[in-house]
Amino acid sequence: MLRVAINGFGRIGRSVLRALYESGKRDQIEIVAVNELSQPEGMAHLLQYDSTHGRFLHKVTHDQEYLYIDLPNGSQDRIRIVHQADISLLPWQSLQVDLVLDCTGVYGSKADGERHIDAGAKKVLFSHPGSADLDNTIIYGVNHDTLLPEHRVVSNGSCTTNCIIPVIKAIDDAFGIESGTITTIHSAMNDQPVIDAYHTDLRRTRAASQSIIPVDTKLHKGIERIFPKFSNKFEAISVRVPTVNVTAMDLSVTINTNVKVNDINQTIVNASQCTLHNIVDYTEAPLVSIDFNHDPHSAIVDGSQTRVSNGHLVKMLVWCDNEWGFANRMLDTALVMKK
């Protein structure tokens, strides 16, 4: 059993805990503690009731020291609540923590990870790309086999790299990619205000529900980190749209091989049934973004939107639940780190 602590109980932290119980991995992973500065009442309430993912199937109660999750057999899981702002003072040693899932979005350097380790954890997995000095960055399904026992401070990438990189790999393996561009159409996030308010990014001073808002993205750097051969070959832009969850990615690539739409789509179908099973899914149904809410795949390719121009320019539409899919990959990567 892998003993895991969650640092940061926001959108991703809570999704990871819920996904553990819904994915059938609870017999392999035990959440022993959650570090969160908010009060236990709010932690329990937001775990039980979620505006995006609905009500948690298990009853959640709490006291000042623990969250309690009721199980179907009548027993309870007990999760220690910690309120510690200084990660170097976290009680990971006494709790015998094997792995910290750092879901704060605040920490992400090798030094940050080592502070968790100095506090008693054996390994750390960050929920965002982090700095370039980390031991490894894992996109599960693509390069998780590169994890080594000595890799102690690791990144799980981002929701968008987990979405697009498996698709890029499938197309590149089959046809050879020369270059590409990506537009991320991302749901609103909690760094955007409900009504206009101050922000260092002037576009993000504007009300999230009123506009389509361009934001900076380093997605191309994330691609290069996994595929160094694509250095200076990909560019990306991103916009935030007034929805609460699910992201669409518009991928355009120039490929070496002369192809037709069916060649591209069949490649994705084959990958979804083999090398990228449970990571990439494929559909041609006339679906919209909300239909992919709570989907555990990293990416869902909408084959009805695939286009090919002049045999070499390929455009694809790829969906993901940027919360739930990523949370499930955090758990997958955690189990690989256990080995």
Curated annotation (Swiss-Prot):
EC number per UniProt: 1.2.1.72
Reactions it catalyzes: D-erythrose 4-phosphate + NAD(+) + H2O = 4-phospho-D-erythronate + NADH + 2 H(+)
Location in the cell: Cytoplasm
Binding sites annotated in the UniProt record for NAD(+): 11-12, 322
GO biological process, one term: pyridoxal phosphate biosynthetic process
Pfam families, A to Z: Gp_dh_C, Gp_dh_N
Recorded metabolic or biological pathway in which this protein acts: Cofactor biosynthesis; pyridoxine 5'-phosphate biosynthesis; pyridoxine 5'-phosphate from D-erythrose 4-phosphate: step 1/5
Annotated active site: 159 (nucleophile)
GO cellular component: cytoplasm
Alphabetical keyword list: Cytoplasm, NAD, Oxidoreductase, Pyridoxine biosynthesis
Main location group: cytoplasm
Residue sites binding substrate per the record: 158-160, 204, 217-218, 240
Site for Activates thiol group during catalysis, residues: 186
Top EC class for this record: oxidoreductase
A GO MF term: NAD binding
Similarity comment: Belongs to the glyceraldehyde-3-phosphate dehydrogenase family. Epd subfamily.
PANTHER family assigned: GLYCERALDEHYDE-3-PHOSPHATE DEHYDROGENASE 2
Subunit structure: Homotetramer.
Role summary: Catalyzes the NAD-dependent conversion of D-erythrose 4-phosphate to 4-phosphoerythronate.
Designated name of the protein: D-erythrose-4-phosphate dehydrogenase
Organism: Aliivibrio salmonicida (strain LFI1238) (Vibrio salmonicida (strain LFI1238))
Gene name for this UniProt entry: epd
